[in-house]
């Protein structure tokens, strides 16, 4: 099944121009993460962040997130780029930000992390699976524990929570409303109107 991408027509004094909706949003410094986070999606988000940084490093970027999560190493590539560039990044949860999506939501510029009123946010520990020889499984287990430690440290920094609380709360799926996520420190405000 192919996905439908809407197009918008923009009229100017020089004529009409057709844009796919994502390109039009990018003109307004808006990036949309919708769906599962994988290497392909992460590469697209990273490219958009780098493009907007090159356009104007002083202007904010609005990063809208509606994601069930995904591959943590893919999310780390987005996270590292968010911190690498100079532009402030407003993160806005629309719908849900779960797992790696919640991690990215919390990683926006402090004071500029938002949720819509009926959004759902969920944090948990990284998921993984391994097969093969016992040694291969042991290597993968050590790596997932290393990633869990890094993720918990970043989440503690982002939220202001103690590392022990993050570790305990992410032991299983931990769901929050927008308001609960605000109290937890994942977001700073609940939005009811556009950021304009």
Curated annotation (Swiss-Prot):
Keywords for this protein: Cytoplasm, Hydrolase, Protease, Serine protease
SUPFAM superfamilies: ClpP/crotonase
Entry-linked PROSITE patterns: CLP_PROTEASE_HIS (PS00382), CLP_PROTEASE_SER (PS00381)
GO biological process: protein quality control for misfolded or incompletely synthesized proteins
Gene Ontology cellular-component terms listed: cytoplasm; endopeptidase Clp complex
Catalyzed reactions per annotation: Hydrolysis of proteins to small peptides in the presence of ATP and magnesium. alpha-casein is the usual test substrate. In the absence of ATP, only oligopeptides shorter than five residues are hydrolyzed (such as succinyl-Leu-Tyr-|-NHMec, and Leu-Tyr-Leu-|-Tyr-Trp, in which cleavage of the -Tyr-|-Leu- and -Tyr-|-Trp bonds also occurs)
InterPro entries for the chain: ClpP, ClpP/crotonase-like_dom_sf, ClpP/TepA, ClpP_His_AS, ClpP_Ser_AS
Enzyme Commission number, as recorded: 3.4.21.92
Pfam families named among the record's database cross-references: CLP_protease
Residues the record marks as active site: 99, 124
GO molecular function: ATP-dependent peptidase activity; ATPase binding; serine-type endopeptidase activity
Protease keyword on record: yes
Protein role: Cleaves peptides in various proteins in a process that requires ATP hydrolysis. Has a chymotrypsin-like activity. Plays a major role in the degradation of misfolded proteins.
Record note on quaternary structure: Fourteen ClpP subunits assemble into 2 heptameric rings which stack back to back to give a disk-like structure with a central cavity, resembling the structure of eukaryotic proteasomes.
Similarity comment: Belongs to the peptidase S14 family.
Protein name: ATP-dependent Clp protease proteolytic subunit
Organism: Helicobacter hepaticus (strain ATCC 51449 / 3B1)
Source species taxonomy: Bacteria, Pseudomonadati, Campylobacterota, Epsilonproteobacteria, Campylobacterales
